[in-house]
Amino acid sequence: MVILTTPPGFRPHHFEYAIQAGKHVFMEKPVATDVPGIRKVLKMAKIAKENKQNVVVGLQRRYQKNYIEIASQIRDDKVGDIVSGQVYWNSAGVWVHPRKPEQTEMEYQMRNWYYFNWLCGDHILEQHIHNIDVANWFIGEYPIAAQGMGGREV
């Protein structure tokens, strides 16, 4: 089994290598930061399924007791029809590793990957994905329309 907890920008390549090596995979979310990465992950996930390799993504809320209970209540029609919803992610910054004089730009970005879109995606991709996943899970389908706003690079 391979556990992928590297920065998301590298995950599609690591996932591809693990699947080609015949390994089962747990990988953190997000699984990629761009469309080519997503395409690679989808392709390799199909191969993994054909080869009966297990792949699990770290969408943690699906394993939290209170979320499981709410999902069960929704499935058992205890809350009525859900006709719309909103999900939010509000957060301040996370860790920052100050630049050291001897560091290259690449090393600095690697150590602070959360702040570089090519490595992280952005805070919506990196963190808000949990709330988007919960909305899809509770509704039981994917949205036909969505809207988002925010920013970190302002």
Segments and roles (model prediction):
Residues M1-I3:
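N-terminal Rossmann-like NAD(P) cofactor-binding module of classical short-chain dehydrogenase/reductase
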Residues P7-P8, P12-Y63, D77:
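Beta-strand-loop-alpha-helix segment that lines the small-molecule cofactor/substrate pocket
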Residues N51-V154:
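Predominantly a Rossmann-like dinucleotide-binding segment in NAD(P)-dependent oxidoreductases
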